[in-house]
């Protein structure tokens, strides 16, 4: 199913890494809309900041024609309700572009494995079940999904810093547990070749040592 959304935003020169935000109101609640994109991929997320409430997220590879982004969705957390697999986002007048500067970790990263007492345990990143983390100019979002079944397993995001070997996430929305919003999660990190290692504790307080790899290393079907 395809639908067209005439979303308004303040237009500025297109660049390959952007974050936009705007607000809307529904049932007396203020909804934050965030869109993060690079030269080929776009994620739209809607959430309420106070009190914290996750609404939806959806994203995929896009093509741009004029003022319209045509997105072939890889995931849609609201799929069971709306059935959308393709959407068009058209420029209007109310998005505000983030002025944050690019950070070295910018990009799409796939969960590639974990480091255990026995060494690295890698997972197959070519299958349909993926966990992806999208980092753009100090904003992050992770999404777990299945590209074949369109199953959505969860998502969370917010903003981050990466300085002197410490990567820190500030959670602004979390589909699985609104109580996680506001938490600050620091990790030790390093980038080695095209892998990003980070070590710390999850939002549940459990130790973790993860390996992420750039999605550009995987030939995708678009």
Predicted regions and their residues:
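Beta-propeller blade signature
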Residues: 157-162
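Bacterial Sec-dependent N-terminal signal peptides
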Residues: 1-21
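Lipid interaction determinants
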Residues: 15-155, 168-222
């Amino acid at each position: 199913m395809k639908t067209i959304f005439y979303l308004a935003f303040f237009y500025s020169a297109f660049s390959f890494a952007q974050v936009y935000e705007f607000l809307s109101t529904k049932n007396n609640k203020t909804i934050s809309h965030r869109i993060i994109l690079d030269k080929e991929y776009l994620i739209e997320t809607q959430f309420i900041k106070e009190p914290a409430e996750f609404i939806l997220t959806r994203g995929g590879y896009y093509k741009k024609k004029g003022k319209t982004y045509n997105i072939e969705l890889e995931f849609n957390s609201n799929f069971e309700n709306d059935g959308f697999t393709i959407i068009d986002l058209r420029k209007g007048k109310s998005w505000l572009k983030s002025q944050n500067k690019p950070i070295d970790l910018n990009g799409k990263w796939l969960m590639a494995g974990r480091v255990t007492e026995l060494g690295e345990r890698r997972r197959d990143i070519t299958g349909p079940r993926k966990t992806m983390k999208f980092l753009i100019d100090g904003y992050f979002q992770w999404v777990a999904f299945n590209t074949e079944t369109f199953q959505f397993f969860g998502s969370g995001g917010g903003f981050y810093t990466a300085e002197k070997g410490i990567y820190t996430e500030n959670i602004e929305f979390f589909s699985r547990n609104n109580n996680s919003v506001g938490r600050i999660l620091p990790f030790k990190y390093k980038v080695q070749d095209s892998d990003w290692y980070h070590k710390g504790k999850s939002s549940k307080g459990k130790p973790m040592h993860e390996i992420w790899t750039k999605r550009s290393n995987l030939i995708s079907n678009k």
